[in-house]
């Protein structure tokens, strides 16, 4: 068997090195060019685009960790793109949580608002009928004031913010006999105190229906300026600073001293 030439040996060595590098590249789980990683990234991106909330939250945490890493020197354009993506994902999370909260609150207070709307509407019709029949000026002024309250009550039941706790205008009396009495209806609570939102609705009525709808559909304000991971880090660090030092058996020195003074763990009442 003859010896191989120098060129043949060099060529075979080069082919072997390339093959080894390709195998290492495919075996490395952190290599971005690994076909498995490429498929995984594409699958994750598809889930994010489809609105998968858990995947969106994971992506938010990953971006925040990347932006907060001091040793990671990112180009300005890459950092700007990541910050814009972070804000967009946070807004999607807020929109989804608000949608769930709105649906929950509407379902929770649906019956209360429905019955109070019916009571206010019935009371307003009664007052309008009395207003048409009376001719006394003092009585007319009183009925107009009561009619205004009933109309605001109706708008309160219609346009109270869906994402806020609904405070009843006509709470049920504790006494069952009073509940059956006619005076326990909306007319009985006509001059009772009203929640602060009632005054807001009363002022918005002067601006028109669009102002009332804006109040009904308003959402709680949120601040996106600070990343969530920093908040949790600060919270954990502050808790660790405030936590007293623990002594033997995992108890604080103060607890151990109190137990020794009181005569042990088992106390008699």
Curated annotation (Swiss-Prot):
It comes from the Eukaryota. It is found in: Nucleus, Nucleolus. Residues 255-269 have a biased composition (Acidic residues). The keyword rRNA processing applies. The keyword Ribonucleoprotein does not apply. Keywords: Coiled coil, Nucleus, rRNA processing. The gene is efg1. It comes from Neurospora crassa (strain ATCC 24698 / 74-OR23-1A / CBS 708.71 / DSM 1257 / FGSC 987). Residues 1-53, 177-269 are annotated as: Disordered. One of its GO terms (biological process) is maturation of SSU-rRNA from tricistronic rRNA transcript (SSU-rRNA, 5.8S rRNA, LSU-rRNA). Involved in rRNA processing. One of its GO terms (cellular component) is nucleolus. Belongs to the EFG1 family. This is rRNA-processing protein efg1.
